Amino acid sequence: ACATQYASEYMDVTVWRDGNKYSLHFKKGKVVGAKKKALEIEPSDENRTGTTIKWRPDLEVFTSISIPHDWYRETMRRQAVVNANVTFRLRIEGDDGEFSEEDFCYPKGIEDYVLEKVGTDYLTEPFFIEADRRGRDREDLPDYNVKITACMCFSRTFMMQEYYHNSSWLENGGSPEKAARSALTSALDAYIKSQGK
């Protein structure tokens, strides 16, 4: 959100939680209003939770804001995949001033996404893995908590490999792809050896 704040002509953030509605407004990256009074807090009758962010790209930062709608759709879909059971709503204003809305939600996250992609014509049922572990990037660095979520299956008709890190799709795979491939190869090798093959 910080990068969006500084690259926006304006950005309005509204958060509903704990029976309140919190609002904060930015222009050109700066908070609108005195620092201590910038955050508006209003009681909310609803048990609503969630966040709404409305912003406009700053034309001094972006020389062209003609971004294809499919890019937004794909980005929202990918966020729904890695944030299970969270609904992302895309609202696009048409030339007539009317808004079209499209929701993206995968209740079981990556598991539902894989099933959507492969359908029912698979060789093996999708296998879902979720684990919390400790890990480190190098020997000289401290350990940290790692949450791993994976889903895989073999299909007769569809091939896909996607990798995500910190809710971001890694178009070119990167280190998480190398780690996943290495771990899968190691696990399959260990299983084959345990079967005496």
Regions found by a protein language model. Give the residues of each.
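GHKL/Bergerat-fold ATPase module in large chromosome/replication-associated machines
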Residues: L90-K197
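GHKL-type ATPase core
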Residues: A1-V118
